[in-house]
C-alpha cells in the first residue's frame, strides 16, 4: 500500500493524492457475482428527490458481497483482492473447497493464498467469521450482525472495526468507533480483524470532476440561494438572521434526530461528540 502525491502537471493534478495497492487484481471482476446497477439520480419511485447531491457518475456493476458468512465448516482460499467501486473497502474473491466462489470484505492483512473459514469451529484469526459468543473478549471485529442471520451491518467501511468489551449471558457489549457502547445478541456473527484499506481516508480527489465521476453533485449553500429555494435564501449581504434550518425548515444544528425508542434499551452509552 503506497500513498502517491501526483506531480502538478495540470491544475487538476496539483493536489491529487492517490492510494496505490499493487496487490489488487488488475483484470475484470468475477462475472457470476456481478449485477447491473441502474442510476437513480437520488429519486424515488415517484420521481421525487429523496437524497440530494446525487447524479451522473461512471457506470458500475454491483458486486454481490457475502455479508452473512454462513458457509460453515468448509475452508476457503483467497484467490485475489479486488477494487470495489461501490464501497471504500477492498473485497476478496474466495474459493471454497466445494467449488463455490464468493466475495467478502477484505480484512487488514489478508493476502491471496491464505485460508479462511466460517462457523463455531473456526480459528481465532483475521478473516474468519463466527458467532460472538465464541470470540474472546477484547477482540476487534468487523462486519457485525445486529440480528442473527441477517448479515453484517456494523463496521463495513475501510478501516472500520468494533471491539468486544464484555459478555453477559445472551448479549455481548460492543464499543463502536463513535464511542457508543451497545448490546447485541451473542449469537450474531462477526468477522475477526478490522476492515482493510484504512489509508482510504488519506486520498485527495484534487478537483470537482473527480467527485462527479463518483456520482456526487455540488452542495450549494442555502444562503447563496433565492428565498423560493431555501429558508436562508435572499436578502442583502450574507446574513440570513435566523436559526440555521434545513431546506424544509427543520432545525439543523444539534437537533436530536433519533426516534427509534424501541432499541434504546440496547444502547449502554451514547456516542461521544
Swiss-Prot record:
GO cellular component labels: large ribosomal subunit
InterPro entries reported in the protein's UniProt record: NA-bd_OB-fold (IPR012340), Rib_uL2_dom2 (IPR014722), Ribosomal_uL2 (IPR002171), Ribosomal_uL2_bac/org-type (IPR005880), Ribosomal_uL2_C (IPR022669), Ribosomal_uL2_CS (IPR022671), Ribosomal_uL2_dom3 (IPR014726), Ribosomal_uL2_RNA-bd_dom (IPR022666)
Segments for region (Disordered): 221-273
GO BP, one annotated term: cytoplasmic translation
GO function term, MF aspect, one: rRNA binding
Signal peptide: none
UniProt xrefs under SMART domains: Ribosomal_L2 (SM01383), Ribosomal_L2_C (SM01382)
HAMAP family named in the record: Ribosomal_uL2_B (MF_01320_B)
PANTHER family the record matches: LARGE RIBOSOMAL SUBUNIT PROTEIN UL2M (PTHR13691:SF5), RIBOSOMAL PROTEIN L2 (PTHR13691)
Name of the protein this chain belongs to: Large ribosomal subunit protein uL2
Amino acid at each position: 500500500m503506497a500513498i502517491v502525491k501526483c506531480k502538478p502537471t495540470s491544475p487538476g493534478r496539483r493536489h491529487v493524492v492517490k492510494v496505490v495497492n499493487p496487490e489488487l487484481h488488475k483484470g475484470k471482476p468475477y462475472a457470476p457475482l456481478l449485477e447491473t446497477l441502474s442510476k437513480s439520480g437520488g429519486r424515488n419511485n415517484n420521481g421525487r428527490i429523496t437524497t440530494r447531491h446525487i447524479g451522473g457518475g461512471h457506470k458500475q456493476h454491483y458486486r454481490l458481497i457475502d455479508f452473512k458468512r454462513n458457509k460453515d465448516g468448509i475452508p476457503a482460499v483467497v484467490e485475489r483482492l479486488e477494487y470495489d467501486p461501490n464501497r471504500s473497502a477492498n473485497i476478496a474473491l474466495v474459493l471454497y473447497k466445494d467449488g463455490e466462489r464468493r466475495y467478502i470484505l477484505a480484512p487488514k492483512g489478508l493476502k491471496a493464498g491464505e485460508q479462511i473459514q466460517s462457523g463455531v469451529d473456526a480459528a481465532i484469526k483475521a478473516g474468519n467469521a463466527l458467532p460472538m459468543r465464541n470470540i474472546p473478549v477484547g477482540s476487534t471485529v468487523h462486519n457485525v450482525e445486529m440480528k442473527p442471520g441477517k448479515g453484517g451491518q456494523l463496521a463495513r467501511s475501510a478501516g472500520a472495526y468494533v471491539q468486544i468489551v464484555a459478555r453477559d449471558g445472551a448479549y455481548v457489549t460492543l464499543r463502536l468507533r463513535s464511542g457508543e457502547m451497545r448490546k447485541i445478541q451473542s449469537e450474531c456473527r462477526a468477522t475477526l480483524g478490522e476492515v482493510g484499506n484504512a489509508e482510504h481516508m488519506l486520498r485527495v480527489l484534487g478537483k470537482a470532476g473527480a467527485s462527479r465521476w463518483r456520482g456526487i453533485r455540488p452542495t450549494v449553500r442555502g444562503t447563496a440561494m433565492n428565498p423560493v429555494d431555501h429558508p436562508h435564501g435572499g436578502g442583502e449581504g450574507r446574513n440570513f438572521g435566523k436559526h440555521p434550518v434545513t431546506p424544509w425548515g427543520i432545525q439543523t444544528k444539534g437537533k436530536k434526530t433519533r426516534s427509534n425508542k424501541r432499541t434504546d434499551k440496547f444502547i449502554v452509552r451514547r456516542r461521544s461528540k
